Design a protein with these regions (language model features):
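Domain-level signature for proteins that mediate thiol-based redox and metal-cofactor handling
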Residues: 1-171
Length: 171
């Protein structure tokens, strides 16, 4: 599937690929992720983002999607059919143990931040995920009334992400 980010393509599977969210910025980060490692072997793959039943791939500008999309789809399909785990069990356990929606932990979160997290989870995250990305609450500054979030996957570096995020929150 195309995403709003022209450098990212989203590949959706009809079954679970990973039970948690994983973002790999390079092959070194993918040492326990056989699927991501395989994708990074291609010279045009810049980043790999996996969540539930999809893989979002960010490419370098050295190739056009029309030239590489079928090859990527086939690699993902063959990997899925092999029955291998996309990410090793140790990494899955480690990722599941992390707080899924925020960089903050329990007692550090004030009531306003909790409300913001709830809004992000219920209204923003599903829309962002449908575009092949993720949003994670980072902080809220009560003095300036500014919310800081981290965009991952297709949303990271997307030229329209600021507008889309602002528009989505306001609506």
């Amino acid at each position: 599937e195309n995403t709003p980010n022209p450098a990212v393509m989203k590949y959706v599977a009809n079954k679970l690929i990973v039970p948690a969210l994983f973002e790999f910025k390079n092959i070194d980060e993918a040492k326990d992720a056989p699927l991501a490692k395989k994708l990074f072997m291609l010279p045009f793959v810049k980043e790999v983002f996996m969540d539930q039943n999809y893989v979002s791939i960010t490419k370098y500008d050295v190739a056009e999607w029309e030239e590489v999309s079928s090859e990527l789809r086939e690699i993902i399909r063959e990997f899925m059919m092999s029955g291998k785990e996309a990410v090793g069990a140790a990494s899955v356990q480690k990722e599941k143990a992390k707080a899924p929606t925020t960089l903050l932990h329990g007692s550090e979160i004030d009531d306003t931040s909790k409300q913001i997290i709830d809004i992000l989870e219920e209204h923003v995250k599903p829309a962002v995920a449908s575009d092949g990305g993720n949003i994670m609450f980072e902080s809220y500054d009560s003095e300036t009334k500014k919310v800081h979030v981290i965009l991952q996957g297709a949303c990271s570096g997307c030229p329209s992400s600021t507008f889309t995020l602002k528009n989505g929150i306001e609506n």
